[in-house]
Amino acid sequence: MAALAEEQTEVAVKLEPEGPPTLLPPQAGDGAGEGSGGTPNNGPNGGGGGNVAVAAAAGGDGGTPKPGVAVSAAAPAGAAPVPAAPAEAGAPHDRQTLLAVLQFLRQSNLREAEEALRREARLLEEAVAGSGAPGELDGAGAEAASALLSRVTASVPGSAAPEPPGTGASVTSVFSGSASGPAAPGKVASVAVEDQPDVSAVLSAYNQQGDPTMYEEYYSGLKHFIECSLDCHRAELSQLFYPLFVHMYLELVYNQHENEAKSFFEKFHGDQECYYQDDLRVLSSLTKKEHMKGNETMLDFRTSKFVLRIYRDSYQLLKRHLQEKQNNQIWNIVQEHLYIDIFDGMPRSKQQIDAMVGSLAGEAKREANKSKVFFGLLKEPEIEVPLDDEDEEGENEEGKPKKKKPKKDSIGSKSKKQDPNAPPQNRIPLPELKDSDKLDKIMNMKETTKRVRLGPDCLPSICFYTFLNAYQGLTAVDVTDDSSLIAGGFADSTVRVWSVTPKKLRSVKQASDLSLIDKESDDVLERIMDEKTASELKILYGHSGPVYGASFSPDRNYLLSSSEDGTVRLWSLQTFTCLVGYKGHNYPVWDTQFSPYGYYFVSGGHDRVARLWATDHYQPLRIFAGHLADVNCTRYHPNSNYVATGSADRTVRLWDVLNGNCVRIFTGHKGPIHSLTFSPNGRFLATGATDGRVLLWDIGHGLMVGELKGHTDTVCSLRFSRDGEILASGSMDNTVRLWDAVKAFEDLETDDFTTATGHINLPENSQELLLGTYMTKSTPVVHLHFTRRNLVLAAGAYSPQ
């Protein structure tokens, strides 16, 4: 048929000249049954057709639209509520809805559309021509009418359970155009919609609009019901308060009920948990519909479903309550904006729930932490270690040489047997060891033999590097693995590198001078260095914004820096110049880190994604997308097969480097995450955030296993000792704290029930695990590092109060 207006958008029903109308398929998720995998989509009344009022403004002569004429099929006033049950085929409100649509089509002279719809519904001509009486349908016609309505309802994105009869809810569609003659067959009907680009968007938005004066009553009624429930159900159902509050407030603002929205916010915002106060402050600034456009907080809530894990009996109790109260306003929000992960067994306590909630999108789904993770270490190559002078074979009193066992690399001996939890050696292509790498491993082994075994009775010494007069604003620090170099990123866009050993920093000679050097000499590596350039400090210029991240390569030949200018730069520590600028992030890059094996590195920034790079590729190899806010910190797993990211959405994610999939989502922090570190054996992960807590995670089972309380400000840095006995944490509260990691992880028994349900019981033993607290005068601790002999190096900029 001919289009009603050239500029109008297309409706979802295509009218063919022959046969019944072809409907678009239902949207994904419609019709899902109840189960533990998600939110059941059948409403509290079990489905069925609701009351529908179709308001149409048909154009008159000359194309001038007439005022909207409402053709309502609502139940008569005073009709008794229908009990909650699946609607029977051919129910009166089903027939009335179809008749209303058919009458509108007839008034608009859309004869072919009317005939096609009437044939499929098998309605009698007299019923349509009548004054709105239901008309008689045979059994097949009744089934067709019910099926047709359900299909039309399913085709609307975001459609939820319909309102029960008598509630007066309506779905309104506004049409305009010329009705001067019949439309041509085979065309697509067009609809002009006010203020929205398509009909489905209007319907979806209007479905969420209820009586603005009733929102407070709906929320208060649910709040009273939950508070009067049994203790076992109260803790479970209390999780609904925050997401329902946010979505009801956003609906009021979106539908321009500003006074009601303000009253609703002032009345109930104080009832929310304290760890949501930062989000509520942002939410309170959204007071007009125009404020919602482009607002990140609003987009997060509207585009991602808030995940709640609720005990099955508690969920059934909630569902029965909403059925009895005919509260479809709340039920629609539950369906459209929440993901209910139902579990069996036993309900969780308030403490267990509080330990896991707090993130921007709720808890993690159980399926998110079921993937197999190879957290074991790769087998190290065996390297022969030459004997030191003092270990050389001597002669005993009889003149016979002493018998000495040949030394092997302790690293190799530690991993002689393949760890069953380790990934295949060739799962990720890693760079081959160079001769210089082998020499460095030999030096590392020698240092290991002199390493102090730490414990509660043998705490490490701490050496603190204080940046004085750092008026450029220290923003990032890193130390090389052998503790010979320290780098700092500053707000004035510079990167500064210091030597912390007597050996000064030297640059390679110019090319003209290098051609004169004998390349066969034994000391060629010394000859190529220019002694005239020797100094304790080198300043690297290149960024055009503050430098927020720095990372040395394992071989100490390169340095990475990330900046507010959206780039990651690779610097040569032989020439102290920039080699490559990696451009991929669209916004500031908050952190970057090299792989333990070099070559690869990861970066994360304000654009909410982390990127995996290789030094010889100017484009990222992987993009890790999934966070709902800034990626503040990144960390490579010791086996280089995984990357951990901490975000301002208060979640930690573990990503598989092989395929880019997210294999773990950890929730529990109440503030943005700013520090991460893996245990040396690769099994555990420690995270720190602005809430001052340090959380410990079992990567294999995907569970929280510990909570360390003591810091009063953001935890900026975390490091395990070389053997994993001690965990050091540095904070903005000017303290370094040492924790007993062995005791925190000992007797860790994760049974099948805990693994399946996530019911964790965190011991309140922070004071027992705290081994020492070390105060600085007035210096926030920005970075921590354990030397190869287990000496702690800390760094920060002096900031007098």
Swiss-Prot record:
Acidic residues bias locations: 385-396
Keyword Transcription regulation recorded: yes
Pfam families: TFIID_NTD2 (PF04494), WD40 (PF00400)
Xref: SUPFAM superfamilies: Taf5 N-terminal domain-like (SSF160897), WD40 repeat-like (SSF50978)
GO terms, molecular function: DNA binding; promoter-specific chromatin binding
Subcellular location field: Nucleus
Compositional bias segments (type: Basic and acidic residues): 408-419
Any one of the GO CC terms: transcription factor TFTC complex
WD repeat ranges, renumbered to this chain: 469-508, 542-581, 584-625, 626-667, 668-707, 710-749
Presence of the UniProt keyword Nucleus in the record: yes
InterPro entries per record: G-protein_beta_WD-40_rep, LisH, TFIID_NTD2, TFIID_NTD2_sf, WD40/YVTN_repeat-like_dom_sf, WD40_repeat_CS, WD40_repeat_dom_sf, WD40_rpt
Alphabetical UniProt keywords: Nucleus, Repeat, Transcription, Transcription regulation, WD repeat
Family: Belongs to the WD repeat TAF5 family.
Subunit description: Homodimer. Component of the TFIID basal transcription factor complex, composed of TATA-box-binding protein TBP, and a number of TBP-associated factors (TAFs), including TAF1, TAF2, TAF3, TAF4, TAF5, TAF6, TAF7, TAF8, TAF9, TAF10, TAF11, TAF12 and TAF13. The TFIID complex structure can be divided into 3 modules TFIID-A, TFIID-B, and TFIID-C. TAF5 forms the TFIID-A module together with TAF3 and TBP, and in TFIID-B with TAF8. Component of the TFTC-HAT complex, at least composed of TAF5L, TAF6L, TADA3L, SUPT3H/SPT3, TAF2, TAF4, TAF5, GCN5L2/GCN5, TAF10 and TRRAP.
Entry domain remark: Distinct domains of TAF5/TAFII100 are required for functional interaction with transcription factor TFIIFB (RAP30) and incorporation into the TFIID complex.
PANTHER family hit by this protein: TRANSCRIPTION INITIATION FACTOR TFIID, TRANSCRIPTION INITIATION FACTOR TFIID SUBUNIT 5
Record-given protein name: Transcription initiation factor TFIID subunit 5
Source species of the chain: Mus musculus (Mouse)
